[in-house]
Amino acid sequence: MDLKILSLATDKTTDKLQEFLQTLKDDDLASLLQNQAVKGRAVGTLLRAVLKGSPCSEEDGALRRYKIYSCCIQLVESGDLQQDVASEIIGLLMLEVHHFPGPLLVDLASDFVGAVREDRLVNGKSLELLPIILTALATKKEVLACGKGDLNGEEYKRQLIDTLCSVRWPQRYMIQLTSVFKDVCLTPEEMNLVVAKVLTMFSKLNLQEIPPLVYQLLVLSSKGSRRSVLDGIIAFFRELDKQHREEQSSDELSELITAPADELYHVEGTVILHIVFAIKLDCELGRELLKHLKAGQQGDPSKCLCPFSIALLLSLTRIQRFEEQVFDLLKTSVVKSFKDLQLLQGSKFLQTLVPQRTCVSTMILEVVRNSVHSWDHVTQGLIEFGFILMDSYGPKKILDGKAVEIGTSLSKMTNQHACKLGANILLETFKIHEMIRQEILEQVLNRVVTRTSSPINHFLDLFSDIIMYAPLILQNCSKVTETFDYLTFLPLQTVQGLLKAVQPLLKISMSMRDSLILVLRKAMFASQLDARKSAVAGFLLLLKNFKVLGSLPSSQCTQSIGVTQVRVDVHSRYSAVANETFCLEIIDSLKRSLGQQADIRLMLYDGFYDVLRRNSQLASSIMQTLFSQLKQFYEPEPDLLPPLKLGACVLTQGSQIFLQEPLDHLLSCIQHCLAWYKSRVVPLQQGDEGEEEEEELYSELDDMLESITVRMIKSELEDFELDKSADFSQNTNVGIKNNICACLIMGVCEVLMEYNFSISNFSKSKFEEILSLFTCYKKFSDILSEKAGKGKAKMTSKVSDSLLSLKFVSDLLTALFRDSIQSHEESLSVLRSSGEFMHYAVNVTLQKIQQLIRTGHVSGPDGQNPDKIFQNLCDITRVLLWRYTSIPTSVEESGKKEKGKSISLLCLEGLQKTFSVVLQFYQPKVQQFLQALDVMGTEEEEAGVTVTQRASFQIRQFQRSLLNLLSSEEDDFNSKEALLLIAVLSTLSRLLEPTSPQFVQMLSWTSKICKEYSQEDASFCKSLMNLFFSLHVLYKSPVTLLRDLSQDIHGQLGDIDQDVEIEKTDHFAVVNLRTAAPTVCLLVLSQAEKVLEEVDWLIAKIKGSANQETLSDKVTPEDASSQAVPPTLLIEKAIVMQLGTLVTFFHELVQTALPSGSCVDTLLKGLSKIYSTLTAFVKYYLQVCQSSRGIPNTVEKLVKLSGSHLTPVCYSFISYVQNKSSDAPKCSEKEKAAVSTTMAKVLRETKPIPNLVFAIEQYEKFLIQLSKKSKVNLMQHMKLSTSRDFKIKGSVLDMVLREDEEDENEEGTASAHTQQDREPAKKRRKKCLS
């Protein structure tokens, strides 16, 4: 039979073939095809012949062809055919589809839909035919009557697609079904339907099946719905990641985790590669991705940005055209996230409305961790982004050798966080990916070497962290060694940071150490001073960190880096003898540098103590070096005055005078080394011969210091040739030399005071010597102060910083104020009897703390050891606190004879600084710090006390002090003390938990002070109100507070209409005639601006959320109702309340007779701001008012309030300001300065007026639009007809200033008209909103 069919098919006509096929039964023909197909015998030829004999032009032929198609589809789906045979059959069927009449095409397509619905398909191979059938059906323009209504081919196609998308798709041929639609021409509606269907199927698949489905979906997206496809993929993986994190965090469900992390992240990586590849082929897809993610920034960023989408963006940076846009988007997202976080943390009002989301920085660091799962396509983007953040947001400016941030406090904090995030990205990437470590290290070091004019501390910190993590990465040491070649060209601070960072590597790499020493030796003899400084810094660092065998262990180690982290025994690599020889060679090199400039010597003297303490076996060499140096400037004759050759310390070079030898620092170094030797070495000595020689050296040094002490006390001003008649001007060589010598003497006196205190053992004679040394110090200090007052500038801060160590300052204060031991009383009375010495001790303490605030460390031994500094701060604070609370300022000042601040006031100033320092540098140790100040009981009791409770205890002490001060007579009010107390309370209040009862008590107390105590001191009022506002915003919104204050200001200053009598309110006594303006007025306006910023932020938030909801409605309408986060209705209500209260606030202020100047200017700007915010709120309702809820009543009331209570009085205030300007008095020729001042005031006050009028009119314009759109008359309370009763002309200002008589008359007439128009408004009482 098959042969006959084939032979008949060769005829030119098909008549015989058709006749023969008609004689066959359908089952016979189907069996023939099946047999041939299963056997694989030229089934294609047979099928081609059968189709040739079944023309669609005839009804029988078309039906037979339809049955053949059905039979072949079943054959292909049976799985009995070989792959090539099945493909051949499908190929032939595809070629013949377009011949089918429309009704049969509908039937064929319906068969496929039924097969999918009933899950009759086995392998889905036949689905390749479906797109051809649908395409052919869409070409049928005629109406097809198939029992389903009269529709044309395109409409049937739409109906079939709709049906197909509504049935359940079997999981095993999901991918084939999706690929069906890529070859079908789809309308946007059909496309959305298909995409939504495929996206809903993601959750029903195994993880490994998702990437190929995503690939098909991306191919399909070239037809449209790109944003829906991307949004759906991102949303799916966002939820999957979230679910995975929740499962991992729950121990109970650890066995039920849906998928292992490895599998999930590998799948995500594959999907990201598919998307990036699709974007390379279809750039529009990339643009849609960026548009989608940018739009998401306006609402809730966490709905768009997640670890998956961030990883996708970072992978996208490999496509050059998108690189810059992606990094800009990520930078914006990071900065916005940090700003939002800070805004939320600083406002209780926002915290109650907006839940805190996951920060973008956390997501990025999660991407870094996930990138370990073969995300090589992400790592390069991570590295680039890390460096972009560090370059963009690192410190930009160096001031006095210190990196300085530029901008507002908010932007500074944001920049610091962004820069730190960049460093964390790079460090974590370095830890995870071995392949890119070299690149990260090279880029960091390139920036360290090339950026000599900008701060690079953040890069040095990163470099140090990298080495600390992996000190054994010797394969990278070649790049570090190359960097050493640039040391001589780098700033000293950079060199020190770089060398500290590489310490661990120097300990384990001999070649690196040798390379560094070679560079340092060359630098030691360089012509540039900075290069020699770098060499000295490097050698000192090596001496500190390469211990000679037998050195004492240092419990006071300042540089834990390389000592605790790197567990490498140096002596296992280098012998003890070699190490000692190496260190002694360095000391010999440093000895030669003692003949160089003062700056070099200074570095050595400041560094030798640390070397000695860390490497005690070098003590003999170091002390011998110092001894030899001192002998050059020491007068050995015991009766010779003065005991030091001060002239030799000063060098004259041509016409210039320089300090050659910092003798005071030399003595300081010797004194500290001696003290260390006596406390650490002497107790361990065994009496060896070498030790006896050392003992002789130390004894001789002691004798020299004793002799210097005695002779310095005996020396008079004339002995130094520096009496009061001497020249101290900075313009002559003699004057400069005398200044240098005087400063040296003062430094020597300080060193000797500390030395004698350390050996005194509370001896009365020693304390008398200390007081005599102080008298000598005071003489020169007074002379320099007196001469500096007459001359130009004082000496530089380098020599004016006190040489007393922080430890000594702490011990001295404790002895002076807290030592109550009976045996010490007589000797201490010597020091305590001198008020000037007591003042000096506290002043030096303040100076040391100020130095710590300024630089982060203090001069002297242990000045860079954070632990030692912290311990000294605790001791100092405890003493200052006791002294201030025990002897109040009022008591001390009543019997005070000395000029200047009292000791109690200085103690309070010290307390204010120490509290600030601890919060700035020692935040993690606050609990320990407060515990040191207040011993409350046993250790068990101490452990249960929180930081809030401890801080509250301290706060109460200062509250009592402030209350006592405020309760005193007005003449006894000490403004300086009050300001310091407020500053201390402000600092301590930051330690209180805002939800605690202690915080509420602090707020209530501050409120009570503001309400009950009236002080006319503007500075005190400003500090107190700032404290009040800073507390209030963490408790609730301050808008009602602002309204009450505005009423008080209005009552104190009066109305702009002098005929109106104001009913005074007394909410806050702190608001009085002296403080109401400008102090309180500017404060409340500033606070109102912050509230408006918060409201603007909320409006942007709900506006973005509305956009997101609109987009999500298009994709998944069923989810729209569930997307109620954040609760926009609550936010809208809160916004209305805020704006309504602020309208009443401005209503009061705008009617207040404010003095000319900053108050008027700031108020006009504030009014412009509230109208801009109102306009933004109206625009939001223009966007959402089409929803069923329409315009809420509260919004209508807000519009009514603004129209009746704000806009009219705004115009009155504008006229008031302009009239005040026009009433400026005439100025004679002699008063030109006054004219210029008047001009500046007029220009400043009237400049914001056009902006305000524009803001009002914009608000009214959008109100009109909203009225039309919402069918609600919102303009009924806006009096447009009387809005302009004045003119805004620049020429008016000139007229005022020129005092032209004719113009003056015209202006007066205009004012009269204005007066007449506004008369009814002025007669009403201004207390309607109180």
Swiss-Prot record:
There is a cross-link at residue 522 (Glycyl lysine isopeptide (Lys-Gly) (interchain with G-Cter in ubiquitin)). The C-terminal 30 residues are probably required for function in DNA repair. This is Fanconi anemia group I protein homolog. The modification Phosphoserine is found at residues 555, 729, 1122. Plays an essential role in the repair of DNA double-strand breaks by homologous recombination and in the repair of interstrand DNA cross-links (ICLs) by promoting FANCD2 monoubiquitination by FANCL and participating in recruitment to DNA repair sites. The FANCI-FANCD2 complex binds and scans double-stranded DNA (dsDNA) for DNA damage; this complex stalls at DNA junctions between double-stranded DNA and single-stranded DNA. Participates in S phase and G2 phase checkpoint activation upon DNA damage. Keywords: Cell cycle, Cytoplasm, DNA damage, DNA repair, Isopeptide bond, Nucleus, Phosphoprotein, Ubl conjugation. One of its GO terms (biological process) is DNA repair. Homodimer. Part of a FANCI-FANCD2 heterodimeric complex that binds and scans dsDNA for DNA damage. Interacts with FANCL. Interacts with MTMR15/FAN1. Interacts with POLN. Interacts with UBL5; the interaction promotes FANCI homodimerization. Residues 1299-1330 are annotated as: Disordered. Monoubiquitinated by FANCL on Lys-522 during S phase and upon genotoxic stress. Deubiquitinated by USP1 as cells enter G2/M, or once DNA repair is completed. Monoubiquitination requires the FANCA-FANCB-FANCC-FANCE-FANCF-FANCG-FANCM complex. Ubiquitination is required for binding to chromatin, DNA repair, and normal cell cycle progression. Monoubiquitination is stimulated by DNA-binding. It is found in: Nucleus; Cytoplasm. It holds the Pfam family FANCI_S2. GO terms for cellular component: cytoplasm; cytosol; DNA repair complex; nucleoplasm. Residues 1321-1330 have a biased composition (Basic residues). Belongs to the Fanconi anemia group I protein family.
